[in-house]
């Protein structure tokens, strides 16, 4: 989000919502799961959620609502606020926790407008993907009709969504257009959230795990599926970064001890030990751990314990799946 300039992208996405006036918004699941390490996918879900909650608010990017009154003002948008009616997410993870959280569709069903199966529509669209898999895509383009038909085993199957928000009547697993009627609905501002107060001396898991927890609270989507404990998939032999947010809101200097418990084969690179904290200060700390190169099918659990003055402040557990290949941690 920092690299993409979040504010600028949010403005553009809200402009697009006001321009096209969608009844339903469908986007990536904003969360951190095994199988969900794609930072750009998660960022898209964050921006779409913000657009759902803000495009109907006339106080958000009001310049988009200004219309031309002079000859030289032709670049003004003259748009109107627009409140979408439903928000759905689709996960990239195959975890069972997503079952029953929204409608399910068979991708071998026929797309009426296109007169081809849904999987085939996805297959054809994928050919225009420009940033990845170019060699693979060139191979797809060379397939004859028989070879394309054989791709159903790879592209067909079941597709499902997770209902994030609905401002109209309907069921959780009903069709995405269930309850939708043409026309505007009133803007529904997300209720304000009272975050928990930090203890005078506290430690919490930061990074994407901490962000998505707060993001879901802020946008009232805390009921979305989430892992039983923080989790991630990394490449065997890679480094695991555990971000910690440390807070000393007392008037005295404090020492916090970070201890790491891990399975055999893992090694601590940095971040464990004693950390001095100045009075009324906040620190952003990282524990770096090297994963073993040996193959293992079982998930590994890493445990970080923070203590001070003889008391445990926090015990943070992360479930790690080691793979042959993996995306960079972000």
Q: What positions do the PLM features span?
A:
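Asparagine-centered strand-capping/turn motif at beta-strand->loop junctions
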Residues: 245-250, 291-292
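Short, solvent-exposed loop/linker segments at beta-strand-coil boundaries, enriched for Pro/Gly
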Residues: 262-268
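Active-site beta-strand->loop->alpha-helix modules in alpha/beta enzyme cores, enriched
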Residues: 1-65
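The feature marks non-catalytic terminal segments
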Residues: 54-222
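Short, solvent-exposed loop/turn segments enriched in Ser/Thr/Gly
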Residues: 236-243, 283-284, 296-302
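Terminal connector regions
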Residues: 293-328
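Beta-sheet-dominated interaction scaffolds and their linkers
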Residues: 202-243, 274
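Short, surface-exposed loop/turn segments at beta-strand-coil junctions that are enriched for proline
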Residues: 276-278, 290-296
């Amino acid at each position: 989000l920092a690299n993409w300039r979040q504010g600028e992208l949010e403005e553009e996405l809200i402009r697009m919502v006001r321009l096209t006036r969608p009844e339903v918004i469908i986007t990536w699941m904003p969360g951190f799961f095994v199988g969900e390490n794609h930072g750009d996918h998660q960022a898209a879900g964050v921006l779409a959620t913000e657009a759902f909650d803000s495009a109907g608010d006339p106080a958000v990017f009001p310049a988009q609502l200004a219309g031309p009154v002079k000859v030289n003002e032709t670049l003004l948008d003259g748009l109107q606020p627009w409140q979408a009616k439903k928000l759905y997410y689709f996960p990239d993870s195959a975890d069972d926790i997503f079952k029953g959280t929204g409608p399910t569709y068979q991708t071998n069903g026929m797309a009426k407008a296109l007169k081809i199966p849904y999987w085939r529509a996805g297959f054809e669209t994928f050919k225009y993907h420009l940033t990845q898999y170019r060699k693979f895509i060139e191979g797809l383009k060379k397939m004859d009709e028989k070879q394309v038909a054989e791709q159903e085993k790879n592209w067909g199957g079941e597709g499902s969504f997770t209902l994030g928000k609905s401002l109209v009547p309907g069921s959780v697993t009903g069709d995405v257009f269930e309850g939708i009627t043409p026309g505007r609905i009133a803007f529904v501002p997300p209720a304000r959230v009272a975050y928990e107060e930090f203890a005078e001396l506290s430690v919490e898991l930061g990074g994407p795990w901490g962000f998505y927890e707060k993001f879901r609270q802020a946008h009232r989507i805390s009921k979305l599926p989430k892992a039983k404990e923080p989790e991630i998939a990394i490449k065997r032999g890679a480094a695991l970064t555990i971000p910690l947010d440390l807070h000393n809101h007392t008037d005295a200097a404090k020492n916090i001890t970070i201890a790491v418990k891990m399975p055999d084969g893992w090694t601590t690179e940095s971040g464990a030990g004693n950390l001095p904290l100045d009075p009324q200060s906040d620190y952003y700390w990282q524990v770096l751990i090297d994963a073993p190169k040996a193959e293992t099918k079982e998930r590994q659990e890493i445990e970080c314990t923070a203590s001070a003055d003889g008391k445990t402040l926090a015990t943070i557990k992360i479930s790690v799946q080691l793979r042959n290949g993996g995306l960079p941690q972000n």
